[in-house]
Swiss-Prot record:
GO molecular function: carbohydrate derivative binding; glucose-6-phosphate isomerase activity; monosaccharide binding
Pfam families named in the record: PGI (PF00342)
UniProt function note: Catalyzes the reversible isomerization of glucose-6-phosphate to fructose-6-phosphate.
Organism this protein belongs to: Francisella philomiragia subsp. philomiragia (strain ATCC 25017 / CCUG 19701 / FSC 153 / O#319-036)
Record-level GO BP terms: gluconeogenesis; glucose 6-phosphate metabolic process; glycolytic process
Family membership noted in the UniProt record: Belongs to the GPI family.
Subcellular location: Cytoplasm
Source species taxonomy: Bacteria, Pseudomonadati, Pseudomonadota, Gammaproteobacteria, Thiotrichales
SUPFAM superfamilies, per the entry: SIS domain (SSF53697)
UniProt-recorded name of the protein: Glucose-6-phosphate isomerase
């Protein structure tokens, strides 16, 4: 990353005091905040000054970020290790202008697929789609993992006030049978439609759960023909889908140019549409599209995803931050951190650059967090008084869907108080005087004061939404998607492959064979620790 060059060492070592910056610049918030439609982005509590921001923006230009953005939107194959375009943005592009990739106008293909999904959703929600026994569908079970689960699950929960179809949507992901059983215990085989979401139709967890769900269905019906009434698929392997018993008319496309962690905008978002209706699903896409245009067309100093990516990369480089906390102050966003963990860590958890050379600077960080105010009674202690450097993103919503205004005001007050506490902290003198005023002796106050000091000067960003609607949620997700892209460009890494997950899958298959046959080559090749663990399992 250019900002990590030795030539910028002096600038990187420049210490910024937030208390000083706010005390000496009455216009700091005005200068270091941005508004886009109904999103307010306040980054004034970050450890930057005019000089640092200038250098960061220059770094973005020197990294050829503008051209890289254009390349992505144009469909150039920026996923170099897999020779693929990165075009999740095309799934929500409302311009309808042609986009030709490998000789085909994918815009036309995308729109056709959207209409197929819309038709299915309307057929099921209207009651025209019937189960094998003639009953209408009441429950949808999405079987998928990773991007086929985390995104849709997050959105369905976040948009719960917009559920309007009467359908109950469930999610099954883990290969642990308990994940599947939780759904099977509350659904009726005669009124359930399963979605099998797997590009290869061979993902171990998804396939095993789907086979077990199929067996459960057939235990009830005892007729193979029932599968076609109760299963649809999202896959590119038509032969495997047909072999499973799913009508190919009910198999929906997945394209190579859409990565799993960016796939909720595709047919993978079908479960979202089943919950909130297709019109609201389109509003989700429209919100993301608005940010796509903002990202592509706005100058860097006013570009929210660019600023987000620059700040995160700056902290990784200059402060060696190894994690970032994401704190949504809205219960509806309770799965947002889980979703972004995959989007961020699977994208930027890389240690070689685009040329395949090892990098000597830090790249991806651990993204973690939880909903407020729960975190205040769990891990915020570390944020305030721990000796690790952790930048924080607060996400808040100005208005809620309910009428409990006192709850909403308390929630927002806590959010803003946490960002203020991180910024200013409380000094020894402040604590000492408070203790004296509370009645403690000087000796007692001196003993206790060091334990109550909060250093402050810890950076945070606040993203404030007017409301949490399908449109604003789509925009929020897209902000973070593009932030991840910006970081990848600055670090000169490929944010769109994920080779690191393959080894564990391969070894898992070998160990599964070894567990059933200790004379197999797979067992003989195991290390002693793994053999010991297998023996312990077999002894039970």
């Amino acid at each position: 990353m250019l900002f990590c060059n030795d030539s910028n060492k002096e600038l990187r070592e420049q210490k910024v005091s937030l208390s000083h910056e706010f005390a000496t610049d009455n216009h700091r918030v005005e200068k270091l905040s941005l508004k886009f439609e109904n999103i307010y982005f306040d980054y004034s509590k970050n450890l930057v000054n005019d000089n640092i921001l200038k250098t960061l923006l220059e770094s973005a230009s020197k990294s050829n970020l503008k051209n890289k953005i254009q390349q992505m939107f144009a469909g150039e194959k920026i996923n170099s290790t897999e020779n693929r375009s990165v075009l999740h943005t095309a799934l929500r592009d409302l311009s309808n202008s042609p986009l030709v990739i490998d000789g085909q106008d994918i815009r036309k293909e995308v729109n056709e697929e959207k209409q197929r999904v819309k038709a299915l959703v309307e057929k099921v929600t209207s009651g025209d789609w019937k189960g094998f026994s003639g009953k209408r569908i009441t429950d949808i079970v999405n079987i998928g993992i990773g991007g086929s689960d985390l995104g849709p699950k997050m959105v369905v929960r976040a948009l719960q006030p917009y559920h309007c179809t009467g359908l109950k949507v469930h999610f099954v992901s883990n290969v642990d049978a308990d994940s599947l059983l939780q759904a099977l215990h509350v659904i009726d085989p005669e009124t359930t439609l399963f979605i099998v979401a797997s590009k290869s139709f061979s993902t171990e967890e998804t396939l095993l759960n789907s086979i077990s769900a199929r067996e459960w269905l057939l235990d009830h019906y005892e007729d193979e023909k029932a599968v076609a009434n109760h299963f649809v698929a999202i896959s590119s392997k038509l032969d495997k889908v047909e072999e499973f018993g799913i009508n190919l008319e009910h198999c929906y496309k997945m394209w190579d140019w859409v990565g799993g962690r960016y796939s909720l905008w595709s047919s993978i978002g079908m479960s979202i549409a089943f919950a909130v209706g297709y019109d609201n699903f389109e509003k989700l896409l429209a919100g993301a599209y608005s940010i796509d245009k903002h990202f592509k067309e706005t100058e860097f100093d006013k570009n929210i995803p660019v600023i987000m990516g620059l700040l995160a990369s700056y902290y990784s480089c200059a402060y060696q931050s190894q994690s970032q906390a994401l704190l949504p102050y809205d219960e509806r966003l309770c799965y947002f951190v889980d979703y972004l963990q995959q989007a961020d860590m699977e994208s930027n958890g890389k240690s070689v650059n685009l040329a395949g050379e090892g990098v000597d600077y830090q790249t991806g960080v651990v993204l973690w967090g939880g909903v407020g105010t729960n975190g205040q009674h769990a891990f915020h202690q570390l944020l305030h008084q721990g000796n690790v450097f952790i930048p924080v993103d607060f996400i808040a919503v100005a208005t809620s869907h309910h009428n409990y205004d006192n709850h909403q005001q308390a929630l927002l007050a806590n959010c803003f108080a946490q960002s203020q506490a991180l910024m200013f902290g409380q000094s020894y003198d402040m604590v000492y005087n408070e203790l004296l005023n509370s009645g403690l002796s000087e000796v007692q106050a001196k003993q206790l004061a060091p334990h109550k000091v909060i250093p402050g000067n810890r950076p945070s960003t606040t993203i404030l939404l007017d409301e949490l609607s399908p449109y604003t949620l789509g925009a929020l997700i897209a902000l973070y998607e593009h932030k991840i892209f910006v970081q990848g460009v600055l670090w000169d890494i490929n944010s769109y492959d994920q080779w690191g997950v393959e080894l564990g899958k391969k070894l898992g298959k070998n160990i599964l064979k070894a567990m059933s046959d200790d004379s197999s080559a797979e067992y003989q090749n195991l290390d002693e620790s793994t053999k010991w663990l297998i023996a312990k399992v077999k002894s039970k």
